[in-house]
Amino acid sequence: MINITKPQNWTRGDYLVSTDPALLQVDAINAALSSDMVWWAGDLPADALWDALRSSICFGLYRKRSSEMNGTGPTVEYKIEEWEQVGLVRMITDGVTFGYLTDVYILPEHQGGGRGRWMLQILNEALQGWPHLRRVMLLTTDKMHLFGKNLGMKDYREFDGMKGVSIAMVEGPGAQH
């Protein structure tokens, strides 16, 4: 189970996936959110984005700024200035029964090396440790195959228990399209 109070880290080559909120780079995240790549989001005032990030479990993807690594293993300290944020998976959750994935991205120049699959595999392993998890949801247009293959997600209408169920939502003033 993901320990919400204790950051966890995974490394592969020059890349790091971390749940450490101290590594999150608001300016980099906002730049991605305001890009065409993350068309559904849009940037936020820095303080509002920090509030959203702190209220979520964030799996940040970072690339080492230099080739000098400061060690390996669980005792390694990761310093924000040594890493460039290049991706994010943000999960809004109660930490027990439900999660909602949003703000999922990897910058285009860092795509294609299996890093998206790696991030989703880490997330999947974390979710498997939640004994009372009922469901994880997300909205997607053309990436369902990626989430299906790596997380086992399906269109909600494919679940037997969802026959006749409608998904309801209301858009707020900050909704982006």
UniProtKB/Swiss-Prot annotation:
Source species of the chain: Gibberella zeae (strain ATCC MYA-4620 / CBS 123657 / FGSC 9075 / NRRL 31084 / PH-1)
CDD domains: NAT_SF (cd04301)
Residue ranges of every copy of the N-acetyltransferase domain listed in the record: 81-174
Annotated Gene3D superfamilies: 3.40.630.30
Function: Putative acetyltransferase; part of the gene cluster that mediates the biosynthesis of butenolide, a mycotoxin that shows antibiotic activity but does not seem to play a major role in the spread of head blight in wheat. Butenolide is derived from glutamic acid via a 4-acetamido-2-butenoic acid intermediate.
Enzyme class, broadest EC rank: transferase
Keyword Nucleotide-binding: no
Domain of life (superkingdom): Eukaryota
Upregulating conditions: Highly expressed under trichothecene-producing conditions.
Positions of transmembrane segments: none
MF-aspect GO terms: acyltransferase activity, transferring groups other than amino-acyl groups
Name of the protein in question: Putative acetyltransferase FG08082
Pathway the protein acts in: Mycotoxin biosynthesis
Pfam families given in the database record: Acetyltransf_1
InterPro entries: Acetyltransferase_Butenolide (IPR053144), Acyl_CoA_acyltransferase (IPR016181), GNAT_dom (IPR000182)
Cysteines engaged in disulfide bonds, as pairs: none
Family classification: Belongs to the acetyltransferase family.
UniProt KW keywords: Acyltransferase, Transferase
EC number annotated for this UniProt entry: 2.3.1.-
